[in-house]
Amino acid sequence: MNESPAQPLTETIPVFTTQNLDIYYGSHRAVRDVSLTIPKNKITAFIGPSGCGKSTILRCFNRLNDLIESFRLEGKVLYHSQDLYSPNIDVTAVRKYIGMVFQKPNPFPKTIFDNVVYGARVNGYKGNLEELAEDSLRRAALWDEVKDKLKASGFSLSGGQQQRLCIARAIAMQPEVLLMDEPCSALDPISTLKVEELMNELKENYTIIIVTHNMQQATRVADYTAFYNAEATDKGNKVGYLVEFDRTGKVFGDPQEQETKDYVSGRFG
């Protein structure tokens, strides 16, 4: 294993930087020594087998792991060079600027309109909520499908529409970053294609990090790819680590590490 995985060229502004990141749950180290830089207005995919820490690392970027009592972190997670885990950080503000889209669509038991503007309303948004809802739904490529039924329940939509509604809800908070944890795993192929097309449109205005088990999806949407692997510990747990991080074409077409070659060729995973 290469202890200093290849880093992509930093021709764009870095949004996140991790430095020697270790993640623990109680005494168990779940992730070890991850150092990487996430570039602005690009799509970065996290790939790797189950248990390698992809989602755990993703949740560090908006501090969702804080909700797990046994969680602790060593090393640094920097957002525009600011330490996200500094005692002075406003975690609520972090989650405003760094939105999250989960594996399964999770609309609220509210109307389509109220789903979109919920976060903005709760946070005291002073602008026009109707304009915000329309703009967010347009950005999420959903407006034309729901503009005549904004008072209908979010649950009335198809699975793919619900996921785009959740993306619209995240966009309405006017974030800089969208974190997506396997956003297409519960969707059919047609809905998946729509979400992938949407991601490519959104990267003009947002930095996107996506966790995916689907390597074909990573090759279709990601500008950069980070491959993680895991190894067993003496106690029978797994610890994840970063193997390789580079442009997606390089990771899949000319990987530098044998582990990466084995994974992308389907030899394990």
Curated annotation (Swiss-Prot):
UniProt entry tagged with the keyword Cell membrane: yes
InterPro entries the UniProt entry points to: AAA+_ATPase, ABC_transporter-like_ATP-bd, ABC_transporter-like_CS, P-loop_NTPase, PstB-like
ABC transporter domain residues: 16-255
EC number: 7.3.2.1
Membrane topology per record: Peripheral membrane protein
Localisation per UniProt entry: Cell inner membrane
GO biological process: phosphate ion transmembrane transport
Binding locations of ATP: 48-55
Cross-referenced Gene3D superfamilies: P-loop containing nucleotide triphosphate hydrolases
A Pfam match: ABC_tran
Function: Part of the ABC transporter complex PstSACB involved in phosphate import. Responsible for energy coupling to the transport system.
Protein name in the entry: Phosphate import ATP-binding protein PstB 1
Species whose genome carries this gene: Synechocystis sp. (strain ATCC 27184 / PCC 6803 / Kazusa)
